[in-house]
Amino acid sequence: MIESALIIVPHPDDEINLAGGLFDVLHESGVRTTVVMCTNGDFISENAAKRFYEAKKTQRIFKYEELIFLGYGDDYVGTHIYDANSNEIAESHAGHRETYCAGNEKEYCFGKTRKHHPYTRENYKSDIRDVILEKEADLIICIDLDSHKDHRCISLLFDECMGEILKTSSNNYRPVILKGFAYNGVWLGPYDFFETQIKPTRILLKSGENLSEKCFPYDWNHRIQMKNGEKTQTLKLWKNPVCKALYAQKTQYCSPITGGCILDHFPRIANPDSCYWYRNAYNQALFAQVEASSGDAHYLNDFMLAVPEDSVSDDLCNHSRGWTPDVEDGQPTISILFAREITLSKIVIFQNCNSTLGTLTIRLDNGFETEFQCPDNNVVTIQLPSVPTERLTMQITSYSNLTINEIECFEPDNGFPWDEVPFTKYEHRIVTRNKLFAFLAEYGFKALVRMVRQYSKMKSPHY
């Protein structure tokens, strides 16, 4: 059963987007919850201390036990810290070159070693890895590949860390790992909270966009939907924890960068469900020896579903670095030797959005062989009749622009462990609110937004 949870986000207030609907559930279930904020949210340097105390106030609203700041910068001058060489010192937008805490506490590394860490990629990754291993939480919820560079940085570094942790032969740590977006379907979701019919999380698509690219590296149909706490759906906004948490972010009332108000996003964020993708730590390919007839096979079992070719700001869905067979390779073949005999029941293949995996032949060492025609999808799932094997061979007979980012192999009964988590599976049903009450709540909400915007303009030196 889940007794502890670790929630990893880039900036103060991202915990609201990523898990704001679930803190009540965690608290009421007695789950000890730690939130890790990787940056100080100091893009505007004079707001750093204020954002620290806003985060502490949000902690009290959400009633979770521990808040940790890693103390890194909110964006960087020149090369982003993710793209820098391992030990190259980066400078943050606020002019810092080492970790610090903007409030009355110490950042994570200083609390452990009495030393600040220079802003290097290696230190950033090391601090994330250290906090994961120190807490050994039963449940981890981490930010995913949003369009923001800091969000991508944390997601990618986390995946690097988890791949290394899980692949360590002496390690038996197998948490429930969930990845989720702060933007898609949440911060940038539809403005629908005050509608009379409650609607689940939806992703808005602009002209020319498709769901595969917006959800990269996942399939939208594979999402795990958690039912959010009941209080997050109340129209009595003074009792709604998501609205209260957003209201606590006074530095974000009227952004001098975008002109937006954080409260504007409440009707988008306060969904009845929280959507995540399950990164199953029992993927047997992680512990296997993987070889390929050509190309770099290490990408196939490193836990990474995306690796930028050049920069963290790359178009990852079409230009992520993965396994690509050589042009001269007439019959690209992948061979997976498992660490032990397993009963193989499912294979999941993750590709770039512009990669097309056509036909492949699957062979197991017991003589089982089948040909599979892959659907036109960047995530391909292959169900097998639970066959014992020590080796899997996949010969690809047709493809186009092929780049495979990861292969997962599972034994039977390795779906999402609903019986272990404190959450309830979200089941969509028609719930109709009182139309007049919804209208009055929205009217009051809009008046509140106008008021806080005016307050911010009066207080901020940027106007």
Roles of regions detected by a PLM:
Residues T424-Y463:
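Membrane-proximal basic amphipathic "stem/tether" segments
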